[in-house]
Amino acid sequence: MPIVKAKPTSPGRRFVEKVVHPHLYKGRPHAPLVEAQGRSGGRNNNGRITSRHIGGGHKQHYRIIDFKRTKDNIPATVERIEYDPNRTAHIALLKYADGERRYIIAPKKLKVGDTVLSGEASPIRPGNCLPLKNIPVGTTISNIELKIGKGAQMARSAGASVQLLGKEGIYAILRLRSGETRRVHVNCRAVIGEVSNTENNLKSLGKAGASRWRGVRPTVRGTAMNPVDHPHGGGEGRTMGKHPTTPWGQKTKGLKTRSNKRTDSMIIRRRRAKKK
């Protein structure tokens, strides 16, 4: 899709770069698959900030996405490709042969009028969903389950993809974009092809207000704060005098924080592993 730059009629317009998607549906989403979505403003049930830099933003409705793809052996036709404000990828509205409609994450090259299928006997085409044991080695996949039947958890954002490297017994070997190599059970499902909207990383919002529309508040540097607000705060001039830390005093820039030992055995090569 082409990247369009606006005429510099204002400082905000000067730096904005948009990706144009003329194939996207311009109407309202399918009403039965839409539900209300509130905003927390980054606060918990006590009203305290638990996630910084969150607040405001345009009101949004949540589109109910079918991440499990368990409607097997029933062909579905792509009615339209839509924008979804809740994610970077585009979504596709499917109409199954029995009349039911569902949203899925749209893979790259999926077009209106295409037919998609789920199940073990599905052909290897973009948008089809089948277990890893039925996918040929070397295939590019996305929307991958980590637990059987739980639904897609991995490679769901715009342009994301994973390569199937091989199969060993009950596990498939996957290589992620980050460089990590890990095992996933062969009965877990995945979708053929990479996720749509691959040019998403090329766009430029152009101004701070565009981030505010998305519900993102400003990020203030710790060195610009007072000592009461951040460990980096205070001092005469630009001084910090200590190792970089989070606002709560935990060391940053390299401190390992992963604590999920239960799945350590599934990771063959870590994304931060040093190259030999």
Curated annotation (Swiss-Prot):
GO MF annotation terms: rRNA binding; structural constituent of ribosome; transferase activity
The protein's role, per its UniProt record: One of the primary rRNA binding proteins. Required for association of the 30S and 50S subunits to form the 70S ribosome, for tRNA binding and peptide bond formation. It has been suggested to have peptidyltransferase activity; this is somewhat controversial. Makes several contacts with the 16S rRNA in the 70S ribosome.
Alphabetized Pfam families for the sequence: Ribosomal_L2, Ribosomal_L2_C
Protein name stated in the entry: Large ribosomal subunit protein uL2
Presence of keyword Ribonucleoprotein: yes
GO BP terms in the entry: cytoplasmic translation
Family statement: Belongs to the universal ribosomal protein uL2 family.
Keyword Ribosomal protein (UniProt): yes
Keywords, comma-separated and alphabetical: Ribonucleoprotein, Ribosomal protein, RNA-binding, rRNA-binding
Region span, Disordered: 33-55, 221-276
UniProt cross-references to InterPro entries, sorted A to Z: NA-bd_OB-fold (IPR012340), Rib_uL2_dom2 (IPR014722), Ribosomal_uL2 (IPR002171), Ribosomal_uL2_bac/org-type (IPR005880), Ribosomal_uL2_C (IPR022669), Ribosomal_uL2_CS (IPR022671), Ribosomal_uL2_dom3 (IPR014726), Ribosomal_uL2_RNA-bd_dom (IPR022666)
One Gene Ontology CC term in the entry: large ribosomal subunit
Gene3D superfamilies, sorted: 2.30.30.30, Nucleic acid-binding proteins (2.40.50.140), Ribosomal protein L2, domain 3 (4.10.950.10)
